[in-house]
Design a protein with these regions (language model features):
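Residues that mark the start of a beta-strand
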Residues: 159-163, 183, 231, 274, ...
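Short FAD-binding loop at a beta-strand-to-alpha-helix junction that anchors the flavin cofactor
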Residues: 347-353
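RNA-binding accessory domains that recognize and position tRNA/RNA substrates
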Residues: 1-194, 198-199, 213, 322, ...
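Cysteine-nucleophile active-site neighborhood
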Residues: 203, 207-288, 361, 370
Length: 392
């Protein structure tokens, strides 16, 4: 039955395994064009508050849950989740066997789907879904990015000025940057690099965002224009566009990573971080270039599975034609996808997961301190004990 706004919506159905944090999930711009299935059986128990929003508008195509709570209980709650969705025009459905749906997605991959309160003929809906355009055909970044620049002040003393390319940036990321002393000037996704550099920043940040990184060539060009000129940091889509700029390739994952419990090994420390993730695409590390054997434990040929490196506790290095040596710093222990890279011959690094969490664990918040250290000129800027960022 309907659990949100009346109407119908089309998109690509994915699943998120987080037990809590539904407000942050539905307000994450990275979900633009997607029908989000929440695997946890009961959703909405603590309502909607005024502090956890990750964007002003909701970008997801729709929400799929098993059991929706209509009478939430929490001291911060101002309204129920179904009321919130209805007010924002988001179509939602409940009484769905979300775990069975998740298994279907895992077996068949993310697929086109629809939710409708108006067309109740399954055959008609299926035909219209099949005729709908795939998510990769649309530039969702242009939909969710800011239209004008804005400035977010540093929390406390301003140590650095950062330009942040808004490809769908979550509010939690800007807050993390501000917390490490960064004054953040957020600019639209298609801002020419010369305009960003004219602001005389100490570093440039490329944010998370929705969709296929191949649909945003202006952002890739901006990355190329910034690399080597000043410190660069990227998260999620930011990691993907940095990878493309460096000459690597990006592939679509079968069903993506969406949730707050993805184990990632930090190859520099050998520690495992439990991370929050939300992406459908990932870089293909071997396409960056050939291995540098003397910096890769003597290995000369790329392994078929990057967990080869986590089993050895080795952070391999490749030689990129454009930017020299690039190190693999993080690997996903579930499927072996690359989760982080570091440029060794210029000041830049990026991560595929979300170190700010929102929602999720705080194992990786050190990434923002690392960016500040990079702008300070610290050579071993990533040498931070992950336990420093953990706050329970």
């Amino acid at each position: 039955r309907s659990a949100g706004a009346e109407g119908e919506t089309f998109g690509e159905v994915v699943f998120n395994t987080s037990m809590v944090g539904y407000q942050e999930i539905v307000s994450d711009p990275s979900y633009a064009g997607q029908l989000v299935t929440l695997t946890y059986p009961q959703v909405g128990n603590y309502g909607i508050n005024e502090v956890d929003m990750q964007s002003r508008e909701l970008a997801l195509a729709g929400l799929i849950v098993h059991d929706m709570c209509y009478q939430p209980s929490n001291w911060q709650s101002v309204k129920s989740l179904p009321c919130f969705l209805a007010e924002r025009g988001i179509v939602a459905i409940e009484d769905v066997d979300t775990r069975a749906l998740t298994l279907r997605i895992r077996e068949g991959g993310a697929m086109k789907a629809a939710i409708s309160t108006t067309d109740l003929d399954p055959a008609s809906l299926v035909a219209r879904v099949q005729a709908s355009a795939p998510i990769a055909d649309h530039n969702y970044v242009a939909d969710v990015s800011c239209k004008e620049p804005c400035v977010i002040p540093a929390k406390g003393e301003c140590r650095h000025k950062v330009v942040a390319y808004d490809c769908g940036e979550k509010a939690g990321i800007a807050k993390r940057l501000a917390a490490v002393g960064c004054e953040v000037t957020v600019v639209p996704w298609d801002t020419p690099a010369e305009k960003a550099l004219a602001l005389d920043p100490d570093g440039v940040f490329f944010s998370n965002g929705p969709g296929d990184p191949e649909t945003v060539p202006p952002v890739v060009e901006a990355v190329r224009a910034c690399l080597g000129k000043l410190p660069v940091f990227g998260i999620c889509l930011g990691n993907q566009v940095i990878s493309l700029a460096a000459g690597g390739q990006v592939e679509k994952l079968p069903y993506g990573h969406h949730g707050g419990n993805e184990p990632v090994m930090n190859l520099l420390t050998g520690k495992v971080e439990i991370t929050a993730q939300n992406h459908n695409y990932a870089p293909v590390f071997p396409t960056f270039g050939p291995l540098v054997p003397e910096l890769s434990d003597g290995v000369t040929k790329h392994p078929s599975d990057l967990r080869f490196w986590s089993s050895r506790h080795v952070a391999p290095v490749v030689m990129s034609e454009r930017y020299g040596r690039i190190r693999l710093t993080h690997v996903n222990l579930n499927d072996g996808t690359p989760e982080g890279i570091q440029f060794l011959d210029l000041p830049a690094f990026s991560m595929q997961y979300h170190p700010e969490a929102k929602p999720g664990p705080n194992d990786s918040t050190y990434a923002f301190a690392a960016f500040a250290r990079l702008m300070d000129g610290v050579e071993d800027y990533l040498a931070i004990d992950v336990r420093e960022g953990r706050r329970f």
